[in-house]
Amino acid sequence: MAFSHTKKVGPTGRFGPRYGLGIRKRVLTVEIKQRKKHVCPFCRSKAVIREAYGIYRCKKCGKQFTGLAYYPYEHLHEYYKIRGGQ
């Protein structure tokens, strides 16, 4: 089977020509943001990974916390809300 990712379409290359360009672009933006490593609100290391729908765990300190469905927090002010204003 041929490689399904290209530089332009990224992980949505697995869909091929299906579903239309607009939907694949939206999925691409969410998946890139979802799969990157996020900053831990407890130890501030860049080691947070998504375990399940809305559940995240820091690989460094081991803390588990909840967040949004696809990424732990949308904006920086939500990150500080998790930290308790610190």
Curated annotation (Swiss-Prot):
Q: Name one GO biological process term.
A: translation
Binding note for cofactor = Binds 1 zinc ion per subunit.
The subunit structure is:
Part of the 50S ribosomal subunit.
Organism, by scientific name, is Nanoarchaeum equitans (strain Kin4-M)
> What exactly does this protein do?
Binds to the 23S rRNA.
Name this protein carries in UniProt: Large ribosomal subunit protein eL43
Gene label: rpl37ae
* Classification lineage: Archaea, Nanobdellota, Candidatus Nanoarchaeia, Nanoarchaeales, Nanoarchaeaceae
C4-type Zn finger ranges: 40-61
Task: Fetch the InterPro entries from UniProt.
Answer: Ribosomal_eL37/eL43, Ribosomal_eL43, Ribosomal_protein_eL43, Ribosomal_zn-bd
